[in-house]
Amino acid sequence: MNRSEPILNSLHLTALFEKQEEMREWRRDIHAHPELGFEEKRTSELVAARLDSFGIEVHRGIGKTGVVGVLKSGTSASSVGLRADMDALPIHEANTFPHRSRHDGVMHACGHDGHTAMLLGAAKHLARTRSFDGTVHFIFQPAEEGIGGAKAMVEDGLFRRFPCESLFGMHNRPGMALGRFAVRSGPMMAGGAFFDIDVAGRGAHGARPESGIDPVLAAAHIATAIQSIVSRNVRPVETAVVSVTQIHAGDAYNVIPQSARLSGTVRAFSTEVMDMIGRNLARIAEGVAAGFGASAKTDFRPIFPPLVNDAREAEFAAGVCAELVGPDKVRRDPPLIMASEDFSYMLAEVPGCYVNIGNGDGEGACEVHNPGYDFNDAALPYGAAFFVRLVEKKLGKTRA
C-alpha cells in the first residue's frame, strides 16, 4: 500500500488497513457460504455475532432476515444510517479458489460479501474509538437481488424503530480503479418494472388462418409498436428503456394458438416517466390487438423506484471520499446506471446517498453477476474508511 495516499493521513483510519486481513477473513467466509434472499440465516447470525462481540446493540429479524446494529456515543440526538446488502445470486460459481461457494448453484456474484465485510469493519472501528457524538445504525439488508429486502425492512418499521437523519450505502464497481469513488447527485440508478401482455385471439388450423384470429401476429405488431413509447413520449434529454424479452405462444407446428404472451422490462429515472410508460403499454397493446380482431390485457408491475441521491448528502459523501483519496480520484458526474437497486426504497424515506467504490480495473476484473466474479479484498479498507470518516464528520467529533 502506498502510504503517501491521503487516506493514511488519519492515524486511526490507518488501523483499517492493519485490520484488512480480518475483514478479508469475514468476506471469504461469507463468500464460501452464500445464501439467497430471505434465506440469509447463517450470514445474519455471523453479522449479529460480530456486532455483539464489538459491544454493539443487535436487533435481529428486521424484514425477515435483516439485522440492525445500534451504536451510541456522547449525548447528541443526531443519527446516521449505514447500509450493506447480504444476499447472493442463483449462479453456479466458476472460480476454483479455496473460498469458492460451497453451495452448488448459489454464489456471491455481486460483491455483497464485500459490502457486508466493509460495514462490519467500520462498525468494529467505531465501536472501539467512539469517535463521534450521536447514534449510528448499521443496517444489514437481506434480499436486494430483485425480491424487495429493502422494502421489507421499511415496512417492518426500520426507520420508525431506528430513526436516521441521513442514510448511506455503497456498491463496488468492477472496471473502476481501486481507491476511487463515484458519487452522483440526483437520479443515479433507474427504477425498474416488469410487464406481461396477454393477447387473446381465436385458435385455428395453421392451413386455415382465415377461420381464426392470430394472436401471434398481433403480438409481433405490439412488440414493434411499443418501441415508439420512448422515442415519441420521453424527452430526448431523459432516458428510458422498454425491452420485450419474451414472447410465448403455441406448442404445435400446424395450429394457430388461442393466445400469446409478451413479457419484458422497463427502466426509467423518474416515477412520472415510469407511470407514463405503463399507461402507454396498455393503450398501445389494446389498440394494436383490436386492429387484428384480438384483445390484450396488460399487467404492469413496478419493482423498484428510481434511486435518487439527495443533493446535499451527495455533496457531503463526495467530500468525504475526496478527503480520503484525493479529489482527483472522486468522479462526481458518473454516467447514469440503467440497472436498478432497492436501496431506492430506503432513500425514498430518508435523505441520503449511494456511492460506488472501485473494485479494480486490471486483468480479471470481470463484471458482477458473472460466474467468475470475486470481490476485490484490497477494496475493503477503502469502503470501511469511507463509512468511518463519514460518521465522524456527520456526527461531529472529527478527530483526525
Model-flagged regions — what are they?
Residues 35, 85-87, 143, 173, ...:
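Active-site beta-loop-alpha junctions enriched in small/polar residues
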Residues 30, 69, 82, 112, ...:
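Divalent metal-coordination and catalytic microenvironments
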Residues 81-83, 92, 195, 354-359:
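Non-cysteine beta-strand/loop elements that form the S-adenosyl-L-methionine
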Residues 67-68, 89-107, 113-114, 126-257, ...:
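Histidine/acidic-residue-rich, glycine-tolerant segments that coordinate divalent metal ions
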